[in-house]
Amino acid sequence: MSQLLAAGGRRLSGEVTIQGAKNSVLPILAATLLTADTVVLRRCPRLKDVEASIRILEALGCTARWQDDALVVDTAGMNGCAIPDALMREMRSSVIFLGAILARCGQAALSSPGGCELGP
């Protein structure tokens, strides 16, 4: 078994740049529905699932725009509680919007999620 030994007693300092990750940003995009304020997500990756999430937000009446490497989401205009079937089928993780829509609207309507088929 290999080991990593760290000798203590020395102060750590410096900077680490954290890059955006799809598995982090998708739940955060859904969580933007929990506020009626503008949310700015810096170093947001421009991926197909992120774009699909943006289309879901827009279908609910929200706005989203790219500003350099940041995604600016404004949910003040949210006026719906149903995600269209076509958007639900774009990605398997679209179901993550359910909790935030329920919290904000008190009800939600969505079909089965889509995305890549898993298994035989």
Regions found by a protein language model. Name each.
Residues 1-120:
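Short, structured segments at the rim of ligand-binding sites
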